[in-house]
Amino acid sequence: MINAKLASQSHANHQTIVKLSEQVSVGGTELVIIGGPCTVESLEQMETVASQLAAAPVQALRGGVYKPRTSPYAFQGMGVEGLQILADVRSRYNVPVVTEVMSIGQIEAVAADADMLQIGSRNMQNFDLLKALGQAGKPILLKRGLASTIEEFVMAAEYILSHGNPDVVLCERGIRSFDNYTRNVLDLGAVAALKQITHLPVIVDPSHAVGKRELVAPLAKAAIACGADGLIIECHPEPEKSVSDARQALSLEDMVNLVHSLRPVAAAVGRNISEVGAGFSLQPAPIHFSAKKPCGLTA
């Protein structure tokens, strides 16, 4: 029995619905799809993503500006500059954005420009960070640690809830295994269990679970079939040129096709894909791009 006083199903007589904006919520009968690149690389990139994914539709955009990388020599993200790009796209297209925070010092700035703050797998048990997020005033997307038990995952959410933030969404993103054919192993049993254990919404990240774009669609469908409230999927205008996690990124065309293919699966389990994103591509203001290379990288 998991001793989660606030996260447990017994604490609430309803399933929690977390609002990202006036039109977009996670939980309930409508499934939410969050899409976008692993890393924010340029304003032009994010404009392209936002305009094309509106047709899917995708209800929120993701994009990393602070990147926790295994190697200290890997690109660490655009930081404040990337955050400004997200803010511009969010404002111009009236679309919620999700991005990761890695430290307490980043919370205030990220919360000012993002609609949901993500806690990545590596920080799932960064307890001081979790406590601080209890006062962030924004919904939190909490990813499961790569070697964490279900109980540890739920208790990490409990830290955020117990420090004042009721808006927590859980994300199953795969756990480490002896088999390295896929990047991780997607634990769909955990999704079903979490839906019984807690009242919190649960979404799935099939991109990080498998690390191979050709396997993302089957696992996305399986996630919806087993009760997930939504998906967060990586996609890129030119996947092979992505500065991080290129192998798992879908093309924007494949992303749109995937969302369409999810509809009959959702219908089979009494759910439907939200149509909200179909209206977020408003008339963007003309933008003049500089010749600066994405991420400040040199050729």
Task: Write out the residue ranges for each language-model feature.
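Intrinsic, low-complexity polybasic segments
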Residues: 278-283
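Glycine-rich, proline-tolerant flexible connector loops at the mouths of alpha/beta enzymes
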Residues: 62-81, 237-247
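Alpha-helix-loop-beta-strand connector modules within alpha/beta enzyme cores
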Residues: 75-99, 133-139, 188-202, 248-270
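Active-site mouth loops of central-metabolism enzymes
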Residues: 31-46, 72-76, 96-100, 120-121, ...
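Catalytic beta/alpha-barrel core
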Residues: 78, 95-105, 115-127, 139-150, ...
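Hydrophobic faces of well-ordered beta-strands that scaffold small-molecule active sites
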Residues: 32-37, 59-63, 97-99, 117-119, ...
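Catalytic alpha/beta core domains of metabolic enzymes, predominantly
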Residues: 136-237
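N-terminal amphipathic alpha-helix/helix-capping segment at the start of soluble metabolic enzymes
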Residues: 1-34, 267-272, 287-289, 295-299
